[in-house]
Every structure is written in C-alpha cells, then in structure tokens.
Amino acid sequence: MSTPTHNLPRTRVSAFCWVALERSTRIERPTSWSWKELSHYSLIVFHCIPDTTPKQIEECFKKFLRRPDIVIILINQVYADMIRPTVDAHNLAVPTVLEIPSKQHPYDSSRDSILKRAQRVITPPERHY
C-alpha cells in the first residue's frame, strides 16, 4: 500500500464531481491523491477510519472550508459531532456542509447544524411585553 501524499494520514478522501454523479460514476483515491488532482471537483465527501482523531478530522474539514473550488461538503453526523463547534461555527452558504447518516449510527435531526439554522429562520423570536 502506498503512502498518502497529503498530510492527514488517517483520512480517506472520496471526491465526486457533478458529471460523475450524473453518470453514477464514483472517482475514489483512498490511498494516494493530491490537492491538485482534486482541484476540478466541486463536491467533497470524506470518510474517516475508526482511529482518526477529532483533531485530524477538524484539520481536514478546515482545509476543505478554505478551498474556493469546493461548494458542498458531505460529512457523516458521527464525525460532525466530533468537531461540532467547528461545524456549527461555519455559517457561510458556500461551501454548504451537509450532515448525512452513517450506516453504523442513527441520524439525529436535533444535532444537524442546517436544521438548527432553518429552525431559527422559521421560528419567530419571542416577544417580551
């Protein structure tokens, strides 16, 4: 197995481009990739192996947030919970961060950052008379 070329050794990155999604084709480079190779993708999904630390997940997540060519980040809710303050602090529309359920953990809508924001928009503020 070759050594990953990125500096987050325990994060496996799967990159999807819209054209590939339309054709139901998945482009994956689990062992070797570079930022240059991913430069033409607009949707990034990253999966973490079980012993990935929250710090490593957060570093990778922040790198994706800083990239101007990424518009959507999909993250399993269990990993978003590991870096919840960072996920909740991200309030820009682009890149949009979508939390998705994993096969091993149930989805909890009360912890989803997008649903929390939507609830704040829909719910009128309390009035004090």
From Swiss-Prot:
Q: Does the keyword NAD apply?
A: no
What the entry lists under Gene3D superfamilies is as follows:
ATPase, V1 complex, subunit F
Annotated Gene Ontology MF terms? proton-transporting ATPase activity, rotational mechanism
> What are the disulfide bonds?
none
From what superkingdom does this record's organism come?
Answer: Eukaryota
Keywords (alphabetical) are: Hydrogen ion transport, Ion transport, Transport
Q: Which GO terms describe its cellular component?
A: membrane; proton-transporting V-type ATPase complex; proton-transporting V-type ATPase, V1 domain
GO BP terms: namely: proton transmembrane transport
Purpose of the protein: Subunit of the V1 complex of vacuolar(H+)-ATPase (V-ATPase), a multisubunit enzyme composed of a peripheral complex (V1) that hydrolyzes ATP and a membrane integral complex (V0) that translocates protons. V-ATPase is responsible for acidifying and maintaining the pH of intracellular compartments and in some cell types, is targeted to the plasma membrane, where it is responsible for acidifying the extracellular environment.
Please give the subunit comment from the record.
Answer: V-ATPase is a heteromultimeric enzyme made up of two complexes: the ATP-hydrolytic V1 complex and the proton translocation V0 complex. The V1 complex consists of three catalytic AB heterodimers that form a heterohexamer, three peripheral stalks each consisting of EG heterodimers, one central rotor including subunits D and F, and the regulatory subunits C and H. The proton translocation complex V0 consists of the proton transport subunit a, a ring of proteolipid subunits c9c'', rotary subunit d, subunits e and f, and the accessory subunits VhaAC45 and ATP6AP2.
Q: Which PANTHER family match?
A: V-TYPE PROTON ATPASE SUBUNIT F, VACUOLAR ATP SYNTHASE SUBUNIT F
Which family would the database say this protein is a member of?
Belongs to the V-ATPase F subunit family.
- Tell me the protein's name: V-type proton ATPase subunit F 2
What is the source species?
Drosophila melanogaster
From the UniProt record, report the name of the gene that encodes this protein: Vha14-2
